[in-house]
Curated annotation (Swiss-Prot):
Signal peptide: none annotated. Catalyzes the transfer of a dimethylallyl group onto the adenine at position 37 in tRNAs that read codons beginning with uridine, leading to the formation of N6-(dimethylallyl)adenosine (i(6)A). Its EC number is 2.5.1.75. The gene is miaA. Keywords: ATP-binding, Magnesium, Nucleotide-binding, Transferase, tRNA processing. Monomer. It catalyses: adenosine(37) in tRNA + dimethylallyl diphosphate = N(6)-dimethylallyladenosine(37) in tRNA + diphosphate. Substrate binds at T16, A17, S18, G19, K20, T21. The record marks T105, R127 as: Interaction with substrate tRNA. It comes from Xanthomonas euvesicatoria pv. vesicatoria (strain 85-10) (Xanthomonas campestris pv. vesicatoria). This is tRNA dimethylallyltransferase.
Length: 327
């Protein structure tokens, strides 16, 4: 049997607050790696505390990629991510380093590892027209429009998901073909690397819930609300007619903080809503991860040795991936 000569990469996956960042840093330091963020919140400048973005010492210790690519009033698509990530991975491999893909955005992982259908490129004029319509009839009204021209896509997209509604209508108006028909086409080429997928997930849901609450409280102690207030004060953000529809503001925690600062309820209510929203995100992430049949699952506290053995075994047949000195 021929030897698989593709470069190796490790994908550190899992629900929010499961310890992905710590594992990615540890693995990068031990196995001479660089980290490629697979997180839709970390691409936005100004989202620091609430997004648990790696801080300056972490970035100094290990090179990080795909952070701070866009301003918070801008949009960044999964297709753009896949293109940028492929380039970053190729450059890491060319340096003789190990790419470590770390994050919890399932759509980004799918776009990168499996490829996306070749959808029409974004048209800012069409997007602006759709956004203007949303101001008149609301996103629910636009969702109803989508249901008439593309019932398959409308059934998959919630009426409160403006980004996906806008994209589906944009594709239809540009091409005359429903986005569901485009998505049924064969995807583009897969990533030309061999990937070990490791999922960090506590076995008991209560443990994950406790980690989520603890992390939110730590973020509040670091002045998360002040961070959101500073985002709100940016002139470009104030110029946005519906900031809650922006992908950056829709990031978990930020939306609830924005609404609280708008005067919707007290601090305790904000905390409860943010925790509940984060739990719901974790549940969706776990549901998606269960579909990754080639992934290996580990409890971040109980399975440290098994996790290490899995990575060592995966890397064993590639001596070109060098360990950092002294490890």
């Amino acid at each position: 049997m021929p030897v698989d000569q593709r470069p190796l990469a490790i994908a550190v996956m899992g629900p929010t607050a499961s310890g992905k960042t710590a594992l990615a840093l540890e693995a990068a330091e031990r196995w001479n790696g660089e980290i490629v963020s697979v997180d839709s919140a970390l691409v936005y400048r100004g989202l620091e505390i609430g997004a648990a973005k790696p801080d300056a010492p972490m970035r100094a210790a290990v090179p990080h990629h795909l952070l701070d690519l866009r301003d918070p009033w801008q949009v960044y698509s999964a297709a753009e991510f896949a293109t940028d990530a492929r380039l970053a991975i190729a450059q890491i491999v060319a340096r003789g380093k190990l790419p470590i893909l770390a994050g919890g955005t399932g759509l980004y992982f799918r776009a990168l590892l499996e490829g996306l259908s070749h959808l029409p490129e974004a048209d800012q004029t069409v997007r602006a027209s759709i956004a203007a319509e949303a101001q008149q009839i609301g996103w629910a009204g636009l969702h109803a429009q989508l249901a008439r021209v593309d019932p398959v896509a409308a059934a998959r997209i919630h009426a409160t998901d403006p980004q996906r509604i806008q994209r589906a209508l944009e594709v239809y108006r540009i091409s005359g073909r429903p986005i569901s028909a485009w998505q049924a086409l064969p995807p583009g080429p897969r990533l030309p690397v061999r990937v070990l997928k490791v999922v960090l997930a506590p076995r008991e849901r209560a443990v994950l819930h406790a980690r989520i609450a603890h992390r939110l409280d730590a973020m509040l102690a670091q002045d998360f609300l002040g961070e959101v207030q500073r985002l709100r004060a940016l002139p470009q953000m104030q110029a946005v007619a519906a900031p809650l529809d922006l992908p950056a503001v829709r990031a978990v925690g930020y939306r609830q903080a924005w609404q609280y600062l708008d005067g919707a309820g007290g601090l305790a209510e904000f905390r409860d809503k943010a925790i509940q929203a984060t739990r719901q995100l974790a549940k969706r992430q776990l549901t998606w991860l269960r579909g990754e049949l080639d992934a290996r699952w580990f409890d971040p506290e109980r399975d440290r040795h098994q996790l290490e053995d899995a990575i060592v075994g995966f890397l064993a047949d590639r001596p070109a991936v060098r360990q950092a000195s002294g490890v």
